[in-house]
């Protein structure tokens, strides 16, 4: 049958319309909630989802896909799961979890997803970075060689830390772990004020995991009163936040710190503390029905911490020479450093500062056990003058502890042993320091030099702290400045501090 001219015209018109028909519909992959409870949602239908991808529930609550199974997807919920019901729609976002980063973050308090919680409005100009990225490779790294000063005599002299190092702070509750971390942040104030370029400034990121909100508020107040908030970022996943946010917060903080590392700047990140992160991860893993291992932790709990801490590094000159220094904190139970999480984190880090309850109650604060504390790479970054001054003090302290234990049983001691006990008691007194009072490195050198070279030997123990406070204030600024020179202390240079310390000591004997 032949088509009439009118019908042929219509057919060709329809054909051209159909061939030129384009749809611009946005296709969202959606699933439905099969079950929900304890912060975990099982979702059916998200077949193309990626591991670690963000999803959005119908109620507006977000979650992250952690378990990809044949039948369904295990999603951990960021927030309350009370608004999520069985049968609710779940939409893929198509993006892996990312957080804001950049200098706009300085002075702000944010949650585990980088959302401001300090009531100061939205963040200004910033970029976004993925929370989970691969750590720099071997070729991109360089040996640690620049000092990262904490302002604590016990740390900077005996367990020095370098920029790009990972130094673990480990101890029981209430032994001053957070105090060491906060003092380190406060100490950067005067160092940053002296910095002449971006490459000398050290920015700080403090990640609070599972702490009380009141504790975090107190910390914000301390930092703002000391004007230390201007170079710091606070990431807070408090005890009242869901476990997924406590698990994610360290990675979010690390991504913020990596912005500085990758742009040729220097940053310090404090994870306070990783024991609580491991507990949050254990809770999530057990609820996701992953098989438990030792102490009911999942099998990949080592990888949880290793992939986080490996991101702290000193970059090579070709990649910008930036650095990210990490101070992870681990809480022990009754001083047991052989528990699962402590034994996992100790081999990952480049050394540890061990704090003890007994020393704390004896008035030795910071309560650092010098025998157990070690810095594996920090000595390469230590100032030459400091290395010369405190080189023998660690050995003398070890000998003192050994002899002091024996001296309790007998009173007949020869002159050499008596001198060793006398010097050791003074060397134990010198590292004591009040909280929130970091000391510049040149003043530390002067005080330790006085103790190591016997200027305090004839002084009563209770007057040593007065002597320590007096000498840095009465010394010539030129003498203090000479300690910072790269050449170290030569015999000629020693004459001036020797004369000054000898005269100063007379008033305290």
Swiss-Prot record:
A Pfam family it matches: ATP-synt_ab_N
GO cellular component, one term: mitochondrial inner membrane
Organism: Nicotiana plumbaginifolia (Leadwort-leaved tobacco)
Protein's name in the database: ATP synthase subunit alpha, mitochondrial
Keywords from the named record: ATP synthesis, ATP-binding, CF(1), Hydrogen ion transport, Ion transport, Membrane, Mitochondrion, Mitochondrion inner membrane, Nucleotide-binding, Transport
Signal sequence annotation: none
InterPro entries: ATP_synth_asu-like_sf, ATP_synth_asu_C, ATP_synth_asu_C_sf, ATP_synth_F1_a_nt-bd_dom, ATP_synth_F1_asu, ATPase_a/bsu_AS, ATPase_F1/V1/A1_a/bsu_N, ATPase_F1/V1/A1_a/bsu_N_sf
Subunit structure: F-type ATPases have 2 components, CF(1) - the catalytic core - and CF(0) - the membrane proton channel. CF(1) has five subunits: alpha(3), beta(3), gamma(1), delta(1), epsilon(1). CF(0) has three main subunits: a, b and c.
Gene: ATPA
């Amino acid at each position: 049958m032949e088509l009439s001219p009118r019908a042929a015209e219509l057919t060709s018109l329809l054909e051209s319309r159909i061939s030129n028909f384009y749809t611009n519909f946005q296709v969202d992959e959606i699933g439905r909630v099969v079950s929900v409870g304890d912060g975990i949602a099982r979702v059916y239908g998200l077949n193309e989802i990626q591991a670690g991808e963000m999803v959005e529930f119908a109620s507006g609550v977000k979650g992250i896909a952690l378990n990809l199974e044949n039948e369904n997807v295990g999603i951990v919920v960021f927030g309350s799961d009370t608004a999520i019901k069985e049968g609710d729609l779940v939409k893929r976002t198509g993006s892996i979890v990312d957080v804001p980063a950049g200098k706009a973050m300085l002075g702000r308090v944010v949650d585990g997803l980088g959302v401001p919680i300090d009531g100061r409005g939205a963040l200004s100009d910033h970029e976004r970075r993925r929370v989970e990225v691969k750590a720099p490779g071997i070729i991109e790294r360089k040996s640690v060689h620049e000092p990262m000063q904490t302002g604590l005599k016990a740390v900077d002299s005996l367990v020095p830390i370098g920029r790009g190092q990972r130094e673990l702070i480990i101890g029981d509750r209430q032994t001053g772990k957070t105090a060491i971390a906060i003092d380190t942040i406060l100490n950067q104030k005067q160092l940053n004020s002296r910095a002449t370029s971006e490459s000398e400034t050290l920015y700080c990121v403090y990640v609070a995991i599972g702490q009380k909100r009141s504790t975090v508020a107190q910390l914000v107040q301390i930092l703002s009163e000391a004007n230390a908030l201007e170079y710091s970022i606070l990431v807070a996943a408090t005890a009242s936040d869901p476990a997924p946010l406590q698990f994610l917060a360290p990675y979010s903080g690390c991504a913020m710190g990596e912005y500085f590392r990758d742009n040729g700047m220097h940053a310090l990140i404090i994870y306070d503390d990783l024991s609580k992160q491991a507990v949050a991860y254990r809770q999530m893993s057990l609820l996701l029905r992953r098989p438990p291992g030792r102490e009911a932790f999942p099998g990949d709990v080592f990888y949880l911490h290793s992939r986080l801490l490996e991101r702290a590094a000193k970059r090579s000159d070709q990649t910008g020479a930036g650095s990210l220094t990490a101070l992870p904190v681990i809480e022990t139970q009754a001083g047991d450093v052989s528990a699962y999480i402590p034994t996992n984190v100790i081999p990952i880090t480049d050394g540890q500062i061990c704090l003890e309850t007994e020393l704390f109650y004896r008035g030795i604060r910071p309560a650092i056990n010098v025998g157990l504390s070690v810095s594996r790479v920090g000595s390469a970054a230590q100032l030459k003058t400091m290395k010369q001054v405190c080189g023998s003090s660690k050995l003398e302290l070890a000998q003192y502890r050994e002899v002091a234990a024996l001296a309790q049983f007998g009173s007949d001691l020869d002159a050499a042993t008596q001198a060793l006990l006398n010097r050791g008691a003074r060397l134990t007194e010198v590292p004591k320091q009040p909280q929130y009072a970091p000391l510049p490195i040149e003043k530390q050198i002067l005080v330790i030099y006085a103790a190591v070279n016997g200027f305090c030997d004839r002084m009563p123990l209770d007057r040593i702290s007065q002597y320590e406070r007096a000498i840095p204030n009465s010394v010539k600024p030129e003498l203090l400045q000479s300690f910072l020179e790269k050449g170290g202390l030569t015999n000629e240079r020693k004459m001036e501090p020797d004369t000054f310390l000898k005269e100063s000591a007379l008033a305290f004997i």
